[in-house]
């Protein structure tokens, strides 16, 4: 017979910290080359013009410019960076 009564509940009481995923720079925001635009798991949003993708699917700006989100087709979104003089 067990000499301890069911006291195992604290072993299951852990959780992992949030991963801080999501959009970091929104549409029409100015970005510098190298700025992270989206952190994501998988290609929820695809890279468009002047946007690079890291090995963890992070999207980042390749040039200075303004962020533009658009639809690639019905189910896919993409993000691009539009260059130009914007006074920043």
UniProtKB/Swiss-Prot annotation:
Residues 1-21 are annotated as: Disordered. Gene3D superfamilies: 2.40.50.100. Keywords: Ribonucleoprotein, Ribosomal protein. InterPro entries: Ribosomal_bL27, Ribosomal_bL27_CS. The keyword Ribosomal protein applies. It holds the Pfam family Ribosomal_L27. It comes from the Bacteria. Transmembrane segments: none annotated. GO terms for molecular function: structural constituent of ribosome. GO terms for biological process: translation. One of its GO terms (cellular component) is cytosolic large ribosomal subunit. PANTHER family: LARGE RIBOSOMAL SUBUNIT PROTEIN BL27M (PTHR15893:SF0), RIBOSOMAL PROTEIN L27 (PTHR15893). Belongs to the bacterial ribosomal protein bL27 family. This is Large ribosomal subunit protein bL27. It comes from Helicobacter pylori (strain J99 / ATCC 700824) (Campylobacter pylori J99). The gene is rpmA.
């Amino acid at each position: 017979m067990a000499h301890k009564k069911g006291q195992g509940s604290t072993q299951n009481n852990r959780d992992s910290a949030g991963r801080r995923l999501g959009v970091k720079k929104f549409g029409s925001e100015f970005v510098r080359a190298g700025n992270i635009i989206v952190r994501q798991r998988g290609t929820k949003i695809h890279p468009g013009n002047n946007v690079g993708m890291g090995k963890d699917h992070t999207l980042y700006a390749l040039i200075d410019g303004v962020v533009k989100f658009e639809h690639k087709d019905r189910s896919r979104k993409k993000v691009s960076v539009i260059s130009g003089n914007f006074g920043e």
